[in-house]
Amino acid sequence: MPIQVLPPQLANQIAAGEVVERPASVVKELVENSLDAGATRVDIDIERGGAKLIRIRDNGCGIKKEELALALARHATSKIASLDDLEAIISLGFRGEALASISSVSRLTLTSRTAEQAEAWQAYAEGRDMDVTVKPAAHPVGTTLEVLDLFYNTPARRKFMRTEKTEFNHIDEIIRRIALARFDVTLNLSHNGKLVRQYRAVAKDGQKERRLGAICGTPFLEQALAIEWQHGDLTLRGWVADPNHTTTALTEIQYCYVNGRMMRDRLINHAIRQACEDKLGADQQPAFVLYLEIDPHQVDVNVHPAKHEVRFHQSRLVHDFIYQGVLSVLQQQTETTLPLEEIAPAPRHVPENRIAAGRNHFAVPAEPTAAREPATPRYSGGASGGNGGRQSAGGWPHAQPGYQKQQGEVYRALLQTPATSPAPEPVAPALDGHSQSFGRVLTIVGGDCALLEHAGTIQLLSLPVAERWLRQAQLTPGQSPVCAQPLLIPLRLKVSADEKAALQKAQSLLGELGIEFQSDAQHVTIRAVPLPLRQQNLQILIPELIGYLAQQTTFATVNIAQWIARNVQSEHPQWSMAQAISLLADVERLCPQLVKAPPGGLLQPVDLHSAMNALKHE
């Protein structure tokens, strides 16, 4: 058979094999087009499970007469015009294949009118070349799409359709997912002339709660814990069911959205499951409705033809962010269940970084952050921290008391708490009793030094050196080994016989440092690393560590921890005041001996008296 160009209808039918799996796929594509058109009301009429009729009617902006023929053409879209648009998609649709594919396997009619037009127009495509016919019609502002006799010309596809009830259940599930994504849109679903679902547009929190209960059920609503979590360009909000009360019926409720787009993403599910694993049985699954907002440039939605999957450019960061967000709300729930005498109001608290920060111009938190630090935090996002989430008290129901006030502070503490902490820290003493302090940070000099004032003296502190001592303290085992953080993607490296022998000899010591691995004939697989190494380039650091071990004759955890601390890359090429204050607070807490006896290269006194005297003699 010679090479030839496929007829338009056959090409569209091939594309339909990826986009149009069943009637529910048609409903999803068409309703998403309505939402992209700015519709606030969408009516979905179904007959015989979608096999006979699918009608989608909206009050969106409509389509101009001269664009109707293009709307049914393949690769025609109003969503993108360049590669830059594709790399920052904010609309639900963008491929320009849905209408052409659907019209090739059904009898599709498109009727639309814009606000500028006095009349509506109707378009439909037919024949081998998919020629489009346009004629006048009566229709209000908006668009109606009718899909008749789905798969009428592809009998093999029609045979794979299930029963009418099964196909409608899939459509119902699609509408439920869309209703959870867009609280501001009214959705009406009818089947065989009967109204089955009606989700009215809502704006207030209580109304959103009622829609959540109508879709997910009262049991989920009763156990739902609100999440509002933010760090940088990442925002996580929504609800997760209390794992302690999760039933089999609730485990089917797993809805996740990325920038408003419904997703089935294994990375997100893994992060949520990992956060709940301590409270879920082996046969249980978490129940959640979560919304992840991320910079569109940091996520690729052009992965799957049906747009069910995405690819994150920084998958490890997204995974750990979601894990920490879910874990934090579960820990908040645990704290609220303590006896009343344990949660009585605490005296005014002075956080550990108050001396370094200077005078506090904002409200003091009602409870000590140290009392909220988990024993084994797993998120590593750098020392910057401090990016509290937006307050959810006015946006989402079931917000935990006091959560919004302390969110930014708790998040900073989570980012910085060492993995060796065996128990929550006691409440910090009053400011006057805090003798272990470098002093107050005045400014940053040269990008990597902090100018400090303490007891009337001025000193210059090297922030990279202080960070190295902090990393060494975090990596040095205390009464228990350093907590190992499992890698989402294990690192597999080829090693020599000498390197393998050195690793096996030091395996127990590396385990105390939180580094876990498995070895075979010629390779070693790194499966876990301690918290300070999560954001390091392990493909460079681990081979260098293996080379260092191969050159040693004896091993000690202190020496290995010291080597790692000296060779990890700093996360701050240019330090800010907030980062310096956070670093010093952690160094003062974990390395108090540095305050009493600073090692060489850490502190350098600045002789202000000589400088002042020199100025006086001028």
From Swiss-Prot:
> What InterPro entries does the annotation carry?
DNA_mismatch_repair_CS, DNA_mismatch_repair_MutL, DNA_mismatch_S5_2-like, HATPase_C_sf, MutL/Mlh/PMS, MutL/Mlh/Pms-like, MutL_C, MutL_C_dimsub
- Which residues lie in Low complexity bias regions? 367-381
Q: Which UniProt key words apply to this protein? A: DNA damage, DNA repair
**Transmembrane helix: is it a keyword of this entry?**
no
Q: Which GO terms describe its cellular component?
A: mismatch repair complex
Has keyword Kinase?
A: no
Regions of compositional bias (Gly residues) in chain numbering: 382-392
Recorded hits in Pfam families, A to Z, give: DNA_mis_repair (PF01119), HATPase_c_3 (PF13589), MutL_C (PF08676)
Q: Where is this region: Disordered?
A: 367-402
Please give the biological process terms from Gene Ontology that the record holds: mismatch repair
GO molecular-function terms, A-Z: ATP binding; ATP hydrolysis activity; ATP-dependent DNA damage sensor activity; mismatched DNA binding
Q: Which domain of life is it from?
A: Bacteria
The function of this protein is: This protein is involved in the repair of mismatches in DNA. It is required for dam-dependent methyl-directed DNA mismatch repair. May act as a 'molecular matchmaker', a protein that promotes the formation of a stable complex between two or more DNA-binding proteins in an ATP-dependent manner without itself being part of a final effector complex.
Homology family: Belongs to the DNA mismatch repair MutL/HexB family.
Q: Which HAMAP family match?
A: DNA_mis_repair
Q: What is this protein called?
A: DNA mismatch repair protein MutL
